[in-house]
Amino acid sequence: MNHSRSHALFAQAQTLLPGGVNSPVRAFKSVGGEPFFVARADGPYLFDVDDNRYIDYVGSWGPMIAGHNHPAVREAVERAIGNGLSFGAPCAAEVTMAQTITRLVPSCEMVRMVNSGTEATLSAVRLARGATGRNRIIKFEGCYHGHGDSFLVKAGSGMLTLGVPTSPGVPAGLSELTATLSFNDFEGATALFDEIGAEVAAVIIEPVVGNANCIPPQAGYLQHLRTLCTRHGALLIFDEVMTGFRVALGGAQAHYGVTPDLTTFGKIIGGGMPVGAYGGRRDLMEQVAPAGPIYQAGTLSGNPVAMAAGLAMLELVQEPGFHTRLSEATSMLCEGLEDAARAAGIAVTTNQVGGMFGLFFTDDIVESYAQATACDITSFNRFFHAMLQRGVYLAPSAYEAGFMSSAHDQAVIEATLAAAREAFADVAR
């Protein structure tokens, strides 16, 4: 493939943007090489500035569950733009969005719109601290909840790509308020609560880890955390920025049958626009300003154009059979990847929950952060580039989940698997 224009743009970008990008994982630091620059997207495809086409399994990191540039979403945005870009005042679409989220996710009796997943998680933790009068939180190794200071302790996503356990600039006194657990460690969770449970405001967790690749919870693990939180008076926060409306219509909490106190959302509820939200029990949400004393605000929160895009996307995922078809397509891809790797003599396993999946270069079933980071990263990186050269774009990090969309039909998946068979053969050489 020719990448001359992308190469020139990246060289220019590096003089203007830190690392040449506006989010670290986009720089290909983990896999090596240089990123391509996208000119447009449609359905399951990205098209770069050098006119190369890629089958896309990143999906803008999750929002594009119905494929890129879906006509219903695009038309909703065009209609909204005709009425103005931002009002700085309430609009009807905000109410409709709140009605939709509270109907689809019953644990959210009230919601507050924000502009990103990071804002949502920061706001949810502030609410938990204010409501409980406690300061400590518990998170999990490899779980990423945005770039808030409290979360950059044994974080996933770009923090794993950079190979550092936390970030400079986070005060030690603040990070000391964040305790960490190993995901899927039942005994460790019980022991930590026995030690500090009376000080814990909240447990925040990705119910399916999506930022140390894709790691599902073991049977009963989320319920175990629910029980511990209830016993010790802590709140349970599900970070469903990634899993919300993707692994099931009601998110991971519906899929696993566990009810959190607070939930954070993003990605799909924006339909590709910058949107986040947090919601939960009415008695908690009524403590948020101006109804209560716990402050949170945002100039562009509830933006009418973003609400229009998100509502259109949420209409699409409510179509009968949407999530069943999405899960079946993801299973077809994962099974095909494992078969292709096996035929090449390469150890690969996959994890899948609904329309999320993970590819691990190992013989073992991956159930923890430690197992994810012990996989053969060199082989993954070679596979990534071999697939990219064949027009298939996987997440440019071994520590990121993959995302299926409803635009990935059987022909697209078969083309992906044909490329994978060749790519695995390259890796095996």
Swiss-Prot record:
Pathway: Porphyrin-containing compound metabolism; protoporphyrin-IX biosynthesis; 5-aminolevulinate from L-glutamyl-tRNA(Glu): step 2/2. The modification N6-(pyridoxal phosphate)lysine is found at residue 267. Its EC number is 5.4.3.8. GO terms for cellular component: cytoplasm. One of its GO terms (biological process) is protoporphyrinogen IX biosynthetic process. Its cofactor is pyridoxal 5'-phosphate. Transmembrane segments: none annotated. Keywords: Cytoplasm, Isomerase, Porphyrin biosynthesis, Pyridoxal phosphate. The keyword Cytoplasm applies. InterPro entries: 4pyrrol_synth_GluAld_NH2Trfase, Aminotrans_3, Aminotrans_3_PPA_site, PyrdxlP-dep_Trfase, PyrdxlP-dep_Trfase_major, PyrdxlP-dep_Trfase_small. Homodimer. Belongs to the class-III pyridoxal-phosphate-dependent aminotransferase family. HemL subfamily. This is Glutamate-1-semialdehyde 2,1-aminomutase. The gene is hemL.
